[in-house]
């Protein structure tokens, strides 16, 4: 069920609440069944734990407690679903959350039809689950002990729609996926110019931990180890070490909307004990004066190892990715955590440098900003749409999750999420941002109006775009029907010769385009056209039908200049053809009977 947006939008809040109650109430009891109401909310993609619904569920919990007390029974959280609320109680529960509730019921989220989208994500997840290659990172024992069968994916849209499947509540360390977050925080505190006085922006073309700097004696970019260490040195440099860590971890938690963000001390200790290369990078950069003047190398490296050891799970990671997708605004809290400029620059570098030595191929195949880590995490960002956290510990030879890479590549094969899928006339993928029914209806209306008005150029354009020009409206009327009825020979010629549509489709009254041609004022033009079409195409194998018809004196028909309705509500004059009248004259033409009768016959 989806509430009509125009009905709710046209009313002030109080009237909206009244209208919503009238739409949801049981007509016999005048009570709202909360189980049905909550199911509508959940189907839109919202979780019961969404902070924006906290007031709603607090009030429902109060009503459930009162109901349990009145019935002298033990309270059970599930009794929320069993509530039947009067108008006053219903409005009392939802008035503080009405904005998000209306958005959910009106289908105004970025993914308006969330369940079909979820079904496709499940299919991709199941396909990737069959992948068994890869090896779990083993340079520290905490990573080596991870179960290689762990596999989880969580999605969070910029409107806070959520979906999780697999092992999405198991904690794991951010590792290198903390690098873009630290870079964004550095730009939040400083300007881009100040940050890039210490670190570059170019892909290095070398290994992520190579002992090298660019021609300016700076790390190439913030997504490799040297650049990430330099970035960490810029985070609250004058603060004490403990305060710096608290600051960054709290910012991570704000990005995650208050969801799980932890810390693995054992991972931190192991990282520090096996960090010879990172210490070498640190001293090399210190020699080349990469760090700010007041930075302390040991503290900088310790903070870097600590931030790599911060834990998330797939669900909280997806909210962090969605915060990046929405320009720094956490989708579940509405809080502006990062500046839009910081996010823009972060996504740019994630796109070009985020996947270790696979970054170029990933940008080519997937075309989306992403950052991976050796724990098996991939933070994937679809700008202005959603963030996805993908986790599977087995890695390929470049340090990226094998299942994660496969999932990302399959994702853009199914959905039009690749950065360049928006190019005109190239995209036939599923776009979950678009209402499929609305898109199909718009296509049919445009196609049929063009055919009825003799607009061959529009029909040609639709055909080149890959549209099915043989599709029909609810009554089974095709573009060929309308071209025949209106006498547009050129449109009929193009549909039959170039598009090779079925010449004899039947509408709900069993009329073919030939029936419409016979009953129209262009009887001889179209009648002979259809007759000779079969003779020339099938029997005599002649190709140029119209030229052949002109030998018999069949002139072409000029395009009729008919008024196109300016709005969907404008009435269009219509009258049945003589053949239609002969079949439906026994019914009143102003009632639904002429439409329903052929179905019953």
Identify the function of each model-found stretch.
Residues 460-468, 493-502, 548-555:
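Ankyrin repeat domain, specifically the short helix-to-loop turn at the C-terminus of the second helix
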Residues 11, 17-18, 37, 73, ...:
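Structured C-terminal helix/loop/strand segments within mature extracytoplasmic catalytic/sensor domains
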Residues 104-123, 133, 186-309, 315-318:
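Active-site-adjacent helix/loop patches that line small-molecule binding or acyl-intermediate pockets
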Residues 159-160, 173-193, 320, 388:
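Active-site SXXK
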Residues 13-31, 50-84:
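Primarily EF-hand calcium-binding motifs
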């Amino acid at each position: 069920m989806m509430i009509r947006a125009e009905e709710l939008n046209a009313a002030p809040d109080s009237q909206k609440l009244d209208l919503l109650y009238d739409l949801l109430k049981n007509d016999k009891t005048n009570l709202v069944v909360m189980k049905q109401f909550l199911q509508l909310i959940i189907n839109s993609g919202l979780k019961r734990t969404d902070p924006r619904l906290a007031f709603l569920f607090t009030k429902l919990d109060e009503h459930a407690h009162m109901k349990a007390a009145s019935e002298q029974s033990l309270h059970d959280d599930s009794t929320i679903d069993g509530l039947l609320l009067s108008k006053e109680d219903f409005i009392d529960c939802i008035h503080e959350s009405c904005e998000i509730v209306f958005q959910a019921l009106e289908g105004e989220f970025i993914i308006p039809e969330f369940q079909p989208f979820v079904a496709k994500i499940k299919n991709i997840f199941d396909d990737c689950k069959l992948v068994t290659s890869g090896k779990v990172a083993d340079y520290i024992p905490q990573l080596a002990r991870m179960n290689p069968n762990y596999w989880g994916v969580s999605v969070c849209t910029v409107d806070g729609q959520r979906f999780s499947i697999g092992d999405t509540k198991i904690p794991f360390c951010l590792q290198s996926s903390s690098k873009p977050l630290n870079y964004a925080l550095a730009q939040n505190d400083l300007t881009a110019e100040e940050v890039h006085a210490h670190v570059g922006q170019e892909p290095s073309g070398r290994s992520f931990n190579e002992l090298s700097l660019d021609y300016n004696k700076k790390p190439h970019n913030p997504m490799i180890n040297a650049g990430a260490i330099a970035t960490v040195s810029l985070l609250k440099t004058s603060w004490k070490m403990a305060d710096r860590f608290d600051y960054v971890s709290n910012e991570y938690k704000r990005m995650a909307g208050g969801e799980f963000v932890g810390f693995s001390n054992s991972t931190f200790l192991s990282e520090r004990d096996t960090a010879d290369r990172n210490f070498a990078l640190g001293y090399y950069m210190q020699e080349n004066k990469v760090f700010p003047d007041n930075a302390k190398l040991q503290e900088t490296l310790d903070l870097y190892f600590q931030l790599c050891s911060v834990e998330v799970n797939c669900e909280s990671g997806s909210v962090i990715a969605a915060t990046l997708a929405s320009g720094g605004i956490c989708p579940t809290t509405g809080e502006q955590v990062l500046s839009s400029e910081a996010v823009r620059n972060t996504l740019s570098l994630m796109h070009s440098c985020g996947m270790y030595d696979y970054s170029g191929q990933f940008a080519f195949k997937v075309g989306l900003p992403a950052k991976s880590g050796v724990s098996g995490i991939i933070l994937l960002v679809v700008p202005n749409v959603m963030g996805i956290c993908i986790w599977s510990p087995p890695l390929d030879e470049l340090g990226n999750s094998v299942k994660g890479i496969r999932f990302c590549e399959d994702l853009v094969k199914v959905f039009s999420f690749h950065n360049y899928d928006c190019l005109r006339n190239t995209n036939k993928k599923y776009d979950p941002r678009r209402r499929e029914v609305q898109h199909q209806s718009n296509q049919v209306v445009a196609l049929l109006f063009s055919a009825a008005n003799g607009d061959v150029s529009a029909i040609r354009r639709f055909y080149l775009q890959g549209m099915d020009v043989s599709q029909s409206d609810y009554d089974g009327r095709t573009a060929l029907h309308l071209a025949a009825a209106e006498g547009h020979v050129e449109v009929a010629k193009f549909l039959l010769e170039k598009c090779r549509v079925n010449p004899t489709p039947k509408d709900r009254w069993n009329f073919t385009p030939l029936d419409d041609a016979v009953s129209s004022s262009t009887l001889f033009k179209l009648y002979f056209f259809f007759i000779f079409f079969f003779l020339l195409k099938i029997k005599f194998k002649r190709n140029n039908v119209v030229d052949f018809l002109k030998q018999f004196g069949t002139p072409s028909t000029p395009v009729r200049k008919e008024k196109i309705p300016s709005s969907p509500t404008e009435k269009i004059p219509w009258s049945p053809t003589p053949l239609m009248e002969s079949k439906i004259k026994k019914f009143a033409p102003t009632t639904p009977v002429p439409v329903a009768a052929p179905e019953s016959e």
